[in-house]
Amino acid sequence: MTGLLDTNVALYLLGGQLAEPLPAGSYGVSVITEMELLAWPSLTTEEEKKVREFLGQVVICELTPSIRGRAVQLRKEQHLKLPDAVVCATAMEFGVELWTNDTSLAKVPGLNCRAVNVTRI
């Protein structure tokens, strides 16, 4: 897996707002991102279809005991929201970059983050 996409980057990708395409490779999302995308409040039937197609093309990273333990540690030590802690722990556990535009996550020790350029529509 090349990198883990945070929910904000997945939304930019789905919305056609990435200024440049992601580099070639295989990408994953945390089970948290999967749930956040599918539970988006104003999601239309057409958008849900697009989200499900996207989810079929990426690796869905399930919660393992190791990820859960690391997420708890990050929540306690870095005071992250639990969903953010799970996403960060997932990237750390897989040893991949977290693609996110959440600047607060870039401060998490041991986490390698990469931001994307976004075009405004």
Task: Describe each PLM feature range.
Residues 1-3, 24-26, 57-59, 92-97:
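Short active-site oxyanion
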Residues 1-29, 38-52, 121:
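Short, well-structured N-terminal submotif of metal-dependent ribonuclease cores
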Residues 2, 88, 92-121:
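Acidic, PIN/NYN-like endoribonuclease modules and their adjacent C-terminal/linker elements
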Residues 6-7, 33, 101:
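A secondary-structure boundary/capping signal
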Residues 10, 34-37, 68, 105-106:
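A generic structural signal for short hydrophobic patches within well-formed alpha-helices
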Residues 25-29, 59, 110-118:
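Active-site regions of enzymes building and remodeling cell-envelope glycoconjugates
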Residues 35-38, 52-55, 72:
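Amphipathic alpha-helical segments within well-ordered protein domains
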Residues 59-103:
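Active-site neighborhoods of divalent-metal-dependent phosphate/nucleic-acid chemistry enzymes
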